[in-house]
A protein has these predicted regions:
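Short acidic-glycine-tyrosine-enriched beta hairpin
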Residues: 25-27, 86-104
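A short glycine-rich, His/Asp/Glu-containing loop-to-beta-strand
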Residues: 14-64, 117-126
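A short beta-strand-loop-beta hairpin characteristic of the jelly-roll/cupin
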Residues: 67, 73-94
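Histidine-centered active-site/metal-ligand motif
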Residues: 65-67, 109
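A short hydrophobic beta-strand segment most commonly corresponding to one strand
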Residues: 98-104, 110-126
Length: 126
């Protein structure tokens, strides 16, 4: 059995802004833990330890554009955020969504809380 896990990559555009890209991680059947049935697994390359973030963005009325501090995976755990890239495109992300933030240069992107606070995410540098 095989499959894929979809994720959104946010990368710097050639015009100096940011843009969304839809991508997938291939999944294959493996025996991850002895005693449990086989499951679909995939690899997410990470460079170092993960960072857990919990934030109540309700006090930020007008979020400013910002860059990703480094290339990183963002695993949404709780809450719903909206990310806007330079061309005005917006996407919402919630629990279970996977984002690859790569726009370390240029204008960056805007992140807004659209659900109830707080939101929680796990950041994996890589």
């Amino acid at each position: 059995m095989t499959g894929t896990k979809s994720f959104t990559r946010i990368a710097a555009s050639t015009a100096g802004g940011s843009a969304f890209h839809d991508e997938e991680i291939p999944l294959d059947t493996s025996l991850a833990i002895t005693g449990l049935p086989s499951m679909l697994t995939g690899t997410i390359p990470a460079a170092s330890a993960a960072v857990y973030v919990r934030h109540d963005m309700s006090g930020a009325p007008h979020p400013a554009p910002h860059n990703a501090p480094r290339r990183q995976w963002v695993v949404m755990l709780r809450g719903i955020i909206e990310v806007e890239v330079t061309d005005g495109s917006r996407r919402t992300f919630g629990p279970g969504d996977l984002i690859r933030a790569e726009d370390t240069d240029g204008t960056g992107h805007v992140t807004r809380l659209v659900g109830d606070p707080p939101w929680e995410a796990l950041y994996l540098p890589g």
